C-alpha cells in the first residue's frame, strides 16, 4: 500500500514535528489532500497524500519528531468513511488486526499519551473526536472518554472546555493533586506552570545561542532626527495611497531603501562566513521581523534594490498578514542577506538585536521620542529622535565600516529626498 513520507522542505530543514493530524484513521483521502500539519523550524506546512484512498495507518503521533523521507502514514484502498468510529461492522478481522497494531503502538508511548490516546479492544468504543480536540485534550491532561460531545457524537474543543469548567467529581478532585505533586515536586511551596516548548521556540533558542557562541557580535549606535522624513510622509501619504491602490507609506520602506544604499557602499555588511571563505552577496533580500502569536518570524522582501517604495510597502504588508495567518511558505523565510527589526512598535527605546543566521548584521529601529536637541550653539529645539543600532559580526565587519554603515543610514533618513532620487 502507498506510504506518505515527509517531503523535502528546504535545504536547512531536516525534520519536523507533527502538529496535528487533519485526517483520522479510516477517513477518505483524495489525491493531493492534506492529511496532517507539520511544524518545522520556520513555518508550518501541510503534508498531502499522492494517492486517493483511505488513511489506514498513522505511523507517528501528534508531537512526534519525524525526519525528511520518513514514512508517516499508509493509504489503503477503498472509499473510507467520515471517521474510523463509523467504519463498517462487517469487517471484524480487519478491526481486530488494526486494534492489535494500535495496542502495540500504545505500549511504546509514554503513560501520559496512553491515557489520552487509549484504544479499546472494540473500535466502536474509541472516542470520536476531531484532531484538534485530541491535541487540546492531551495538552490539558483531559481524558476524552470522560467528555460528552454536544453534536454528532464528535468531541470538539468546546466540549473539552465545558468539561473543564464543570465541577470536578470527587475522584478527579482527589487524583489531580497527586499528579501535580509528582510533576512539580521540585517546587514544593511555589506555584509553577510547566509546558513543553514548541518546535519553533526550541529551534529559535538553539539558533540564538549558536549565533552568540559562534560570532564575534558587537553593537554600535547612532541617532536619527526623523523631522524631515515625517514631514515628507505627512505631505505625500494621501497621494501615495491614491497612486498605489491604497498602499500606505510607512517608515519601513525608507529604512529598507537606506539599508540597500548602505549595503552597496559597505558590501562586507552583506556577507557571511562559510568555512574559510567569505561570501559577499550581490543581491539585496531584506528580512523584516514580524511578531506573531508563535514568536518572531523573519520573512524576506526579495530584490529590494529593484523595487520602489510602494512595492516594498505592499510586500511588507503582505508578508506580515501571511505570518500572522500562518501562511508563510519556506521560500519566504530562507536565503536573506540582511535584516531589519523594529522594537519601537513595542515601545523599545534602545536594544542590541541579535544577528539572524547566515548574515553579518542586523539593523534595529526604535521608538520615536521627542526630546530637546542642540541645533547649534545658541538654539535648542524639540525634535522627533530615534536611536538606531547595528549589531554585526566583528569577524567580517570592522568597527570603522560598521560606524560608517550606520552613519549612512542616518544621513539618508535625515535627507529622504536623496532616497527618492536614488529610487
From Swiss-Prot:
GO cellular component terms listed in the entry, alphabetical order: cytosol; oxoglutarate dehydrogenase complex
EC number(s) on file: 2.3.1.61
UniProt biased composition (Low complexity): 165-177
One Gene Ontology term of the molecular function aspect: dihydrolipoyllysine-residue succinyltransferase activity
Family annotation (InterPro entries): 2-oxoA_DH_lipoyl-BS, 2-oxoacid_dehydrogenase, 2-oxoacid_DH_actylTfrase, Biotin_lipoyl, CAT-like_dom_sf, E3-bd_dom_sf, PSBD, Single_hybrid_motif
Pathway: Amino-acid degradation; L-lysine degradation via saccharopine pathway; glutaryl-CoA from L-lysine: step 6/6
Active site positions, chain numbering: 394, 398
UniProt domain Peripheral subunit-binding (PSBD): residue ranges: 128-164
Compositionally skewed regions (Polar residues) per UniProt: 80-96, 116-131
Function: E2 component of the 2-oxoglutarate dehydrogenase (OGDH) complex which catalyzes the second step in the conversion of 2-oxoglutarate to succinyl-CoA and CO(2).
Protein name: Dihydrolipoyllysine-residue succinyltransferase component of 2-oxoglutarate dehydrogenase complex
Amino acid at each position: 500500500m502507498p506510504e506518505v513520507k515527509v517531503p523535502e522542505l528546504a535545504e536547512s530543514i531536516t525534520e519536523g514535528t507533527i502538529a496535528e493530524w487533519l485526517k483520522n484513521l479510516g477517513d477518505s483521502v483524495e489525491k493531493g489532500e492534506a492529511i496532517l500539519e507539520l511544524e518545522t523550524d520556520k513555518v508550518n506546512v501541510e503534508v498531502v497524500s499522492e494517492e486517493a484512498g483511505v488513511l489506514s495507518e498513522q505511523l507517528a503521533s501528534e508531537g512526534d519528531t519525524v525526519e525528511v523521507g520518513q514514512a508517516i502514514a499508509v493509504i489503503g484502498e477503498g472509499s473510507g468513511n467520515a471517521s474510523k468510529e463509523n467504519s463498517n461492522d462487517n469487517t471484524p478481522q480487519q478491526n481486530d488486526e488494526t486494534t492489535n497494531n494500535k495496542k502495540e503502538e500504545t505500549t511504546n508511548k509514554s503513560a501520559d499519551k496512553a491515557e489520552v490516546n487509549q484504544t479499546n479492544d472494540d473500535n466502536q468504543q474509541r472516542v470520536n473526536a476531531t484532531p484538534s480536540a485530541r491535541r487540546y485534550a492531551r495538552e490539558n491532561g483531559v481524558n476524552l472518554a470522560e467528555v460528552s460531545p454536544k453534536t454528532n457524537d464528535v468531541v470538539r474543543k468546546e466540549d473539552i472546555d465545558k468539561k473543564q469548567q464543570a465541577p470536578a467529581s470527587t475522584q478527579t478532585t482527589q487524583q489531580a493533586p497527586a499528579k501535580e505533586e509528582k510533576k512539580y515536586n521540585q517546587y514544593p511551596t511555589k506555584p509553577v506552570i510547566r509546558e513543553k516548548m514548541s518546535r519553533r521556540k526550541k529551534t529559535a533558542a538553539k539558533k540564538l545561542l549558536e549565533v552568540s557562541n559562534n560570532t564575534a557580535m558587537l553593537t554600535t549606535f547612532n541617532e536619527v532626527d526623523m523631522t524631515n522624513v515625517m514631514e515628507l510622509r505627512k505631505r505625500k501619504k494621501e497621494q501615495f495611497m491614491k497612486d498605489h491602490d491604497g498602499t500606505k507609506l510607512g517608515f519601513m520602506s525608507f529604512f529598507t531603501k537606506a539599508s540597500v544604499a548602505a549595503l552597496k557602499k559597505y558590501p562586507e555588511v552583506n556577507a557571511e562566513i562559510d568555512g574559510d571563505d567569505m561570501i559577499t552577496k550581490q543581491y539585496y533580500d531584506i528580512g523584516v521581523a514580524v511578531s506573531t502569536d508563535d514568536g518572531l518570524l523573519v520573512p524576506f522582501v526579495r530584490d529590494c534594490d529593484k523595487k520602489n517604495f510602494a512595492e516594498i510597502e505592499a510586500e511588507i504588508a503582505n508578508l506580515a498578514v501571511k505570518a500572522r495567518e500562518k501562511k508563510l511558505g519556506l521560500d519566504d523565510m530562507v536565503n536573506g542577506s540582511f535584516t531589519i527589526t523594529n522594537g519601537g512598535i513595542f515601545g523599545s527605546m534602545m536594544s542590541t538585536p541579535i544577528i539572524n543566521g547566515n548574515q553579518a548584521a542586523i539593523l534595529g529601529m526604535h521608538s520615536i521620542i521627542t526630546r530637546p536637541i542642540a541645533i547649534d550653539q545658541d538654539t535648542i529645539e524639540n525634535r522627533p529622535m530615534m536611536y538606531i543600532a547595528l549589531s554585526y559580526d566583528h569577524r567580517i565587519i570592522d568597527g570603522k565600516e560598521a560606524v560608517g554603515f550606520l552613519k549612512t543610514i542616518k544621513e539618508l533618513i535625515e535627507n529622504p529626498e536623496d532616497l527618492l532620487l536614488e529610487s
